[in-house]
Amino acid sequence: MTDVTVKSLADEIQTPVDRLVQQFADAGIKKSEVDSVTQQEKETLLAHLNREHGSAPNKLTLQRKTRSTLNIPSTGGKSKSVQIEVRKKRTYVNTPEAEQAKAEEQAQREAEEQAQREAEAAAQKIAEEKAKRAAEEQAKREAAEKAKRQAAEKEKVTNQQTDEKTKPAQTDKARREAEAAELKRSVEEETRRKVEEDAKRVAEEARKMAAENEGKWPEPVAEQTESADYHVTTSQHARAAEDENDAKVEGDRRSRTRGGKATKQKKGNKLSESKADREEARAVGRKGKRKPSTLQQSFNKPVVAVNRDVVIGETVTVAELANKMAVKGSQVIKAMMKLGAMATINQVIDQETAQLVAEEMGHKVILRRENELEEALMSDRDTGAEAAAEHRAPVVTIMGHVDHGKTSLLDYIRSTKVASGEAGGITQHIGAYHVETENGMITFLDTPGHAAFTSMRARGAQATDIVVLVVAADDGVMPQTIEAIQHAKAANVPVVVAVNKIDKPAADPNRVKTELIQHGIISEDFGGDVPFIEVSAKVGTGIDDLLQAILLQAEVMELKAVRTGMASGVVIESFLDKGRGPVATVLVQQGTLNKGDIVLCGFEYGRVRAMRDELGRDITSAGPSIPVEILGLSSVPAAGDEVTVVRDEKKAREVALYRQGKFREVKLARQQKSKLENMFANMTEGEVSELNIVIKSDVQGSCEAICDSLEKLSTDEVKVRIVGSGVGGITETDATLAAASGAIILGFNVRADASARRVVETEGLDLRYYSVIYSLIDEVKQAMSGMLAPEYKQQIIGLAEVRDVFKSPKFGAIAGCMVTEGVIKRNNPIRVLRDNVVIYEGELESLRRFKDDVNEVRNGMECGIGVKNYNDVRTGDVIEVFEIIEIKRTIA
């Protein structure tokens, strides 16, 4: 037979090559994948595998099927035949432990049989020697008797001999008798000595065998047989048991058939025993002398709690936490309910909750960080730490109340007219610009002043070095001014106050200074450290002083940054451009951002395909404190995300996907839990009306601001639910979502495409466009007001005094009244007052004047009034007529 390689042999026997090479190595043959294998080496490997795994089958399955007919008596004295088929299947497993126990039992049995045979042989030998000695004694006795007879005969013949001859004969006889007794005594002693020696030898051998096999055999053989697994039986026992059981079933069937009735089983009948009892009795022994013992479970439940080290990630399900602690999921749910939180077995819980539950159940918690890949990616960055830090331009954020002139002030500095381009003349985006002055460069961030843009102002304060607080001299401190002060204090950045509109006649700078003192902004004139600059964005008054104050403050702060190395920064704003895709406005804080760099930005990543400055010009690099627009990200990032340049695009993608999954898990884990204390609040949720809205905006910041503002409009009766929101134009998907959820579509500075308009027309959806956030919020308020349940108010329209009471066969008591105030109308509800206390409330049944039915009676006229289902009208009562007015409610 030709030799084959290891790889071809592995393909032939369908096993991995590595496993086959390892098996050759275990057999003592060193082979590689391309080496050839001879027939002898194959046989050597096969012999090794047989020794390793064994070639005998370890499992034997017996299947039997018996059919029988059972006659069952029924009503009417007839019997009904029922066909019975009994199918039996038993599997006997020959495990290595069973084989070892069987071999040990066989060895012990053979040793006992050998000892018994040796004892029997010794006893037989002793018996043979004893019989031989008895035969010898018998022969001696017979010889003595024969000699005695011969002597007697000789005595008779020689009776006449002399006494001299007789005396020696008697002496010989006595001597022979003494010799015979001595021989008998010696034979008995020899026999007894040999028997004692044989007994000692057998006992000594038994002791040696017991000492050698101590630890190998169980103590008593009978107990080993009892405690052995009754499944480990020989095939002969199995067949015998099957035959015996079949014979019992067949005999029972025949007895039923002969008697026509099922005979009652006796109390001691073996058929009443369970199958396990019968097999246990068969495993104990076939002789039946020993009573079957009850099987005892060898495993005892531990009574001491086991404390484990539980490793918990940032999120974990209840089932996973239970598996880590080796307990049932129901126990974890009970522990969470004791802590005041309800959860299902598949619910995701956060790390803090899981830690509390595990520690409550007595386990040690090990918190695991899952962002090793992200840390490794961030550590493999060339940050230029060895380079010297250089001075950089300050980042200045313009903040203040709406319409106080922030953008106009910045426009005058930049000598542009951006404010006219903003819808409604208010800023709705963060604008980032850098300006070259005579004393250096300054980067400005213009934030919205409207109340809806709180989060955008907070982001601007966090990314800035200096805050310029713009306050109108004729308007003073307003709510958004106070909020801007709070953002500046939270970000711990210095403030420069610009008192704008100083050219107006109603300007009062001292009033502004006084009002700001209440909020911790103290002017230098009043002994504080905050510079106040009076400016006019319209005529340019004080602009140079403002820039000088900003640069002076920056010089005091000693702002520095490293220009070399990989860049890092923050996203100021982001939006989706129809032609360019996702666009992000990034403020570079460290390093230099170059075209072609791989960036990781929050949940998104990508390569910088293009860079543009605030004027729309293409640039190739941007240093610290320079705002740029970058293209090439995978999607629109969230405003405020950190931008980092990394080396590997593949790892950047993995980190971005990991962040997305982590954010989703954390969001699910931290959703509103069904806690015990708000169960009743959840029961009343069905009574609340919902206004579903789909919002699409041009930039991420505006979308976020609109969503926050609309959610704040929710009341106890009407709830605003944002079904979907995003950046970019209104697409067919958005229209389909609105149709499915019954929502209205609001577009802020965006429009719907043709397919979306087609869906809107087909489904009859409400689509509205806005360019100013004021209008959007006001119209949503109106829509919510229409969903509010109206209020009802009772208004008194007339009073009538009862002057006399008449009886009518048709209406009962009729009150003759004088209208003292207002108008009495026929179809309105009434109240009957007695001593200014309401005693009845109902409606008019009849209103007449001079026997004529009328619809109303005015002040100063008499009339007859019949009250429906009420006859206890008395003189002096007052009848009050009122009407119910519906009042529409509005949301403030």
From Swiss-Prot:
InterPro entries for this protein: DNA-bd_dom_put_sf, EF-G-like_DII, EFTu-like_2, IF2_assoc_dom_bac, IF2_II, IF2_N, P-loop_NTPase, Small_GTP-bd
Biased composition annotated in UniProt, kind: Basic and acidic residues: 99-217, 239-254, 270-283
Biased segments, Polar residues type: 68-82, 224-237
Transmembrane segments: none
GO cellular component terms, A-Z: cytosol
Molecular functions per Gene Ontology: GTP binding; GTPase activity; guanosine tetraphosphate binding; translation initiation factor activity
All residue ranges annotated as the tr-type G domain in the record: 391-560
HAMAP family given in the database record: IF_2_B
Annotated protein name in UniProt: Translation initiation factor IF-2
Record organism: Yersinia enterocolitica serotype O:8 / biotype 1B (strain NCTC 13174 / 8081)
